[in-house]
Amino acid sequence: KLKKNITDKTDKMIEEYEAICADLGLRLKTMSMGELITELEKGLKPKVENIDFIAFSARKIKEMEEAGRGGSAKSYKTTIESLKRFIKRDTLNISEITSGFMEDYEKYLKDRKPLTKRVLGDRAISMYPGYIRALHNLAKKEYNDEELGIIRIPWSPFAKYLVKKPTPAKKRNLPAEVIKKIITLPDGPETNIGLTRANLAKDVFALSFFLIGMNTADLYNCDCISDGRITYQRTKTKNRRSDKAEISVKIEPEAMPLVEKYFDRTRHRVFKFYKSYSSADGFNAAVNRGLKKIGELVGVDDLEFYAARHSWATIARNDLHVNKYVVHEALNHVDDAMKVTDMYLKKDYSQNDDANRRVITYVLTGDDGVKKRGKK
């Protein structure tokens, strides 16, 4: 296989040399060896003006989507749309991406007016240039061949321009009493689409909390419910993990009314959200819009869906002192230091189940289980 790869590259290089010599015509007969080498080097120099960074990025984003990396594709697509607004056109010669260009783009991100009511945070100002750097590196990997001395993209703007480190994300966890307010909030009269969406958002938020922070993409896509458990592969990370990021969550009694309310009777999926929304992104957007109304009712500015997941983890760890590794596992995260050990262990979700039971009881009743354990 290695021999074939070398042969293919050599054949390609010979073809390029032959094409250059053919273009030289009769001049070739009068040239010295040094002059010929100069002409060959000139002919092999990259025509960088033909490398459109926007078109290249669109192709890479499509590859991500086809590989099932929808979340990553969405982030890169948002970045490229921002870049197009900055340059005010749909094409960008890769040679234009210099350290000065990136500094101007960063300033644009800091100064520009947001397209929505939400302010573009420091994390986005860091993330967008970071995604551009990643795409630029992919382009260099594709168009350059250092082994054969073919360098079509010689610039390294990110050697001088350093992507800023993001500021720590704003903590999105809510105290137990606020979570209880959201969960127990009565449905509003569905007199308009806004109130209907708010009721849905409240239910989905509660469902997520009861299911250990299950996110909207997984609530939308999951298709396995059996023996009182929902088993699913986490959409965000399943393509990056050997275990497909699979996890099983016990349906606690408090979650059952919501499971039954949104249950898909056709059994194509666990929940029928896909019948009302054509994509997980559309479903997520509707839930987050509805949560803004719920936030107003419970006194939380800019309430976000992910607060359910963050709050579950914080309450489990800080209020109930659940073992940090159990919280880590319940959130379906991977500990690199434990990867080898995990290969030998059969998955056991009982500790996750116990932690979830304690969290739900604590939020709804205030009972942290300490007295009960002390009596034993």
Predicted regions and their residues:
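N-terminal DNA-binding recognition helix of tyrosine site-specific recombinases/integrases
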Residues: 82-85, 95, 115-157, 214
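Active-site/catalytic core of tyrosine-dependent DNA strand-transfer enzymes
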Residues: 179, 252-301
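C-terminal catalytic core of tyrosine-transesterase DNA break-rejoin enzymes
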Residues: 206, 210, 214-217, 309-333
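Conserved tyrosine-mediated DNA breakage-rejoining catalytic core shared by Y-recombinases
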Residues: 220-261
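C-terminal secondary-structure termini that scaffold catalytic or DNA-interacting sites
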Residues: 253, 274-278, 338-339, 351-376
